[in-house]
Amino acid sequence: MTAFFECGPFSARDGEGHVLFEDVSLSLSDGQCVAIEGPSGGGKSTLLRYLTGLAWSPDAGRGLDGVDYPCAQLPVWRSLVTLIAQDAPMIAGSLRDNLRFPFSQRAGKGRGFDDGEAVRLLESVGLGRLPLDREIRTLSGGERHRIALVRGLMWDPSVLVADETLSGLDPEAVTASFDLLLAFARRPGRLVICVFHDPALNARADRHLRLANGRLEEVR
């Protein structure tokens, strides 16, 4: 059976020339949440950038749902395999401006933005009290992390890649946000790949991988 998501092999070194990982590939089915953990500085964020096409490797293959995406089609790949970055970058403007931002780009042409869906998802992560016209600069780091998650879910990519998106949240917000990720992941034709440092979250994922000593290995 052909895997839903196939990517690699990737190799990377840090700024001092030390190997972060070597010949790492992923072959994953849809309808699941895959957690990746490992020591700090071990290359997890770098690997996610390769998976999403934000870092380029000329020798790596990329396939999604039976379709290959060569390097010339990286912009298409990036619209289908979306990264929620660890620092939750935002643009100047309102909460609505930030949620709408992907839809204003070339890849989002023709895709509608639904205020009602935005409010529903914000309520699901405990931010229902925030009006959509609230200035983003007035929000805390934890609120921005949850807004970045909502933005990724609204974009509805085939593969959602989350880099420590739930870091710094209170336990209630972590549970609510992870439940949303799981619900998204369990849909046919969807996949979530995430990095957590929380053993409880790794245990709830459908698959648990560990990146350490340059290798990506199955934990369960």
Q: What feature does the model see in each segment?
A:
Residues E37-P39:
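The feature captures the beta-strand-to-loop junction immediately N-terminal to the Walker
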Residues T52:
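Helix-to-loop junction immediately C-terminal to a conserved catalytic motif
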Residues G61-V76:
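ABC ATPase NBD Q-loop/coupling interface
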Residues D87-F101, A107-K109:
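Conserved catalytic motifs of ABC-family nucleotide-binding domains
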Residues F113-P131:
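Conserved ABC ATPase "signature" region
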Residues E135-L139, E143:
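Conserved ABC ATPase signature
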Residues G152-L153:
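ABC ATPase C-loop
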Residues L160-E164:
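Catalytic Walker B motif of ABC-type/P-loop ATPase nucleotide-binding domains
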